[in-house]
Regions:
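Transmembrane helical cores of multi-pass secondary ion antiporters/exchangers
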Residues: 2-470
């Protein structure tokens, strides 16, 4: 053996062994190489396929999920099993590395979502948003729980409480996705329209309710107690956490932000915000809830701080959106196994879940809109727009799989529901919105924002005042 080969072998052996007296174990050289290769491949494919999806007018989420599907059990494991076993070994200790990066990504993504929560906007929408969101949540939740009790054994992990599985499925089917909906409304130039504002405000309420419902159901899954007792305990702990966040957490967050603002540049502020996200996430996780709830609540507290300009956190948002979030969704695709759909029982159950998800959300939103005295076309537009599940449903599915509530088959079905509903929402919304005549106020707002977006053109003072009042 050459001296170079001997040195390489010696180095590999030394890196594979824990160092005496080291505070933490050292990652073996081969494991580190595999991890870096996984990370680079997932990010590269997710970015490429995400851009390709966007080029065809589809959500980038679809391409990012496909990145994981391509090199996961659905395709690579069948086309090249040896390569799959080498690239993605089924050793949990090794897969946890890539999973940890994805979890960090989703924590920061949800935290940034919470930062953009506009409570004033919700108050302005008032009664209509409350009715639409209430029925839009309850109808699909009830239907999802109902079919959850009818699910075949292939969809449920052995030993799982049927009530917990049914609740998980109900939560997955009742949520809506703010990022996907906001992107659709922006691309269709509906954000300035009253219907666009109402869809967005209702989806915000859905999003907030979704995180809390997910946390309660997750607590039930891990409580190991009777469902009723565990539910009461979870709700009590959740109420204590929210109250403490409003009374103590808000002041603590404001103090940290003021302290960080004294640093030079935005780097200290970005680091402080990241630390706050992680600490709040750790607290909710310690209480038995999902860590993402803590990140969301922390984001809402940060966003409500009058001293913070959210634009200063743009570098963090860019990094999360461009790097960490695509890796998370690619890892979500890795856990899908489309070959499960070859089982007629799973395929039939999947089609039923998809039909219930679409019909339940549509019927609930339509009913709420009609109760709020909206027109038929406005109700149809709301049903179509709120049907987009996207990001939050993928997160719900990931949580269910990690907690051992969902099988690979049921996980795959739920993620496919997120993909299909995100793809079908734009054409249905476009069809309904085109039949809603714009009001004079909406025309003024559209002209105002067009003027802002046109280089070298500034609306006059009277025009600005009129647009804002509209």
């Amino acid at each position: 053996m050459s001296s170079a080969a001997t040195l390489a072998a010696s180095l590999n052996t030394s890196l594979s062994m824990p160092l005496a007296g080291a505070p933490v174990a050292v990652i073996p050289a081969h494991h580190l190489m595999t991890f870096l290769l996984q990370l680079g491949l997932l990010l590269g494919l997710a970015t490429l396929l995400g851009r390709l999806s966007a080029r065809f007018g589809l959500p980038a989420l679809l391409g990012e999920l496909c990145a994981g599907i391509l090199i996961g059990p659905s395709l690579l494991a069948n086309a090249a099993p040896d390569l799959f076993a080498w690239l993605l070994p089924q050793d949990p200790a090794r897969f946890h590395l890539i999973d940890a990066v994805g979890q960090l990504g989703v924590l920061l993504l949800v935290g940034m979502t919470g930062m953009h929560l506009d409570t004033g906007f919700l108050r302005r929408q008032g009664r209509s948003a409350a009715w639409i969101s209430g029925t839009g949540l309850l109808v699909p939740l009830a239907l999802g729980v109902g079919i959850g009790f009818l699910a075949p054994p292939e969809m449920i992990v052995g030993g799982t409480d049927p009530m917990v599985f049914a609740l998980f499925l109900g939560v997955a089917l009742c949520v809506s996705a703010i990022p996907v909906i906001a992107k659709i409304l922006t691309e269709m130039r509906l954000l300035h329209r009253d219907i666009g504002q109402l869809i967005l405000s209702t989806s915000v309420i859905d999003d907030v309710a979704g995180w809390f419902l997910l946390s309660v159901v997750s607590a039930l899954a891990t409580a190991g107690a009777r469902t009723g007792q565990a539910a009461l305990t979870a709700i009590a702990l959740l109420a204590v956490f929210v109250l403490a966040s409003l009374l103590i957490g808000r002041r603590a967050v404001a103090a940290v932000l003021r302290l960080a603002d004294r640093g030079q540049g935005d780097r200290t502020l970005i680091a402080a915000v990241t630390v706050l996200f992680l600490l709040f996430a750790a607290v909710t996780h310690a209480l038995g809830f999902e860590a993402i709830l803590g990140a969301f609540v922390c984001g809402a507290l940060i966003g409500s701080s009058p001293d913070l300009k959210v634009a200063r956190l743009a570098p963090l948002q860019t990094f999360v959106a461009a790097v960490l979030a695509p890796i998370f969704f690619a890892t979500a695709g890795l856990r899908m196994d489309l070959t499960e759909l070859a089982n007629p029982v799973v395929l039939g159950a999947g089609l039923l879940v998809l039909a219930v998800a679409i019909a339940g959300k549509f019927a609930g939103a339509y009913l709420g809109a009609r109760i709020a005295r909206r027109t038929r076309w406005e109700a149809l537009a709301l049903g179509a727009g709120l049907n987009s599940r996207g990001v939050i449903e993928v997160i719900v599915a990931m949580v269910g799989l990690r907690l051992g509530v969902l099988t690979t088959a049921s996980y795959t079905v739920i993620v496919l529901v997120a993909v299909v509903t995100s793809m079908m929402a734009p054409p249905l919304l476009r069809f309904a919105a085109s039949r809603i005549a714009p009001t004079e106020d909406e025309v003024v707002r559209e002209e105002f924002f067009d003027a802002l977006e046109t280089p070298g053109q500034t609306p006059d003072k009277q025009f600005v005042t009129t647009a804002k009042e509209a």
